């Protein structure tokens, strides 16, 4: 995961 994924809505929590 990366910062972009987090900004997209916390992907792969």
UniProtKB/Swiss-Prot annotation:
Intracellular or extracellular location(s): Secreted, Cell wall
Keywords, in A-Z order: Cell wall, Secreted
Organism, as annotated: Solanum lycopersicum (Tomato)
GO cellular component, one term: extracellular region
Name of this protein: 21 kDa cell wall protein
